[in-house]
Each structure stands twice: as structure tokens, then as C-alpha cells.
């Protein structure tokens, strides 16, 4: 396959019993994951730290973001949800497929492998909207 480590995780059905984030706030954590290193290394560790023209954070030219690496391995890449990273970037370079609410994932599946960053509705305050039978008990093993 194109991504033997990711394929191995998927094939073996790994369940993560403990998960950790790279930062205590969402934008810094999301930025670190997509860059592949601690947000402190590139200055993106403060929540929404690259917002204005004067405060933009530019990554070094030799940095490749995870979706760019996936594209090089033959994947279609898309983002459905948050893409506010703590650095300046070219959205069209990072994601090569424009996803909309009517995109058929089966259609994507048969064209080529895809890497999608997907944020579902939810967040910190919306857990009361999830029906009880769909909630996951983190203590189950």
C-alpha cells in the first residue's frame, strides 16, 4: 500500500484506550498534528496565533503538511470542517478536493484512496444532542 503504517493500524483494528492531544486548545493541537511536530517549534502554540497580516506565522518552505505527503502517495485530500491552523498556508495546495455536503464518499472510494480531515457536529457544549444509545462509554474495554 501507499501508507503501510496507517494500513497496518486499520487492518489490525487498533483501539486507542488512551488518547492525548498535543496542546490544550483546539487550533494549536490541530496545527501540530497537521504539521507533524510540536506547535512550539513553529510558533503556533497559542490559540489562533496567526490571524492578522501582521501576526502571520509562515512555515519554512521545506515543511510538508500531512495532506501534502498523502497527495504525494496518491491520495485525494480534503477538509470538511475546521481548517483554521495557526500558520499561513495555501488551502488549494494542501487539499486537492473540494468537499461539499453532497459529496458521495462511495464515489471518492472507487476513484483512489483519500485522506480527509473531518469534523462532525459536536464540540464542547453539544453532547446533550447525542442520543444515549450512540454515546460511547470510555471505560468499556
Residue map of PLM features:
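Formylglycine-dependent sulfatase
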Residues: 1-141
Amino acid at each position: 500500500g501507499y501508507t503501510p503504517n496507517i494500513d497496518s493500524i486499520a487492518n489490525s483494528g487498533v483501539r486507542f484506550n488512551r488518547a492525548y492531544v498535543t496542546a490544550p486548545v483546539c487550533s494549536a493541537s490541530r496545527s501540530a498534528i497537521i504539521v507533524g511536530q510540536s506547535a512550539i517549534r513553529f510558533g503556533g502554540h497559542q490559540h489562533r496565533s496567526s490571524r492578522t497580516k501582521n501576526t502571520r506565522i509562515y512555515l519554512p518552505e521545506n515543511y510538508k503538511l500531512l495532506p501534502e505527503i498523502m497527495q504525494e502517495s496518491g491520495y485525494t485530500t480534503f477538509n470538511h470542517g475546521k481548517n483554521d491552523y495557526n500558520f499561513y498556508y495555501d488551502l488549494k495546495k494542501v487539499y486537492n478536493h473540494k468537499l461539499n455536503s453532497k459529496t458521495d464518499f462511495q464515489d471518492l472510494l472507487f476513484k483512489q484512496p483519500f485522506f480527509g480531515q473531518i469534523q462532525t457536529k459536536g464540540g464542547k457544549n453539544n453532547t446533550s444532542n447525542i442520543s444515549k444509545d450512540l454515546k460511547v462509554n470510555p471505560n468499556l474495554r
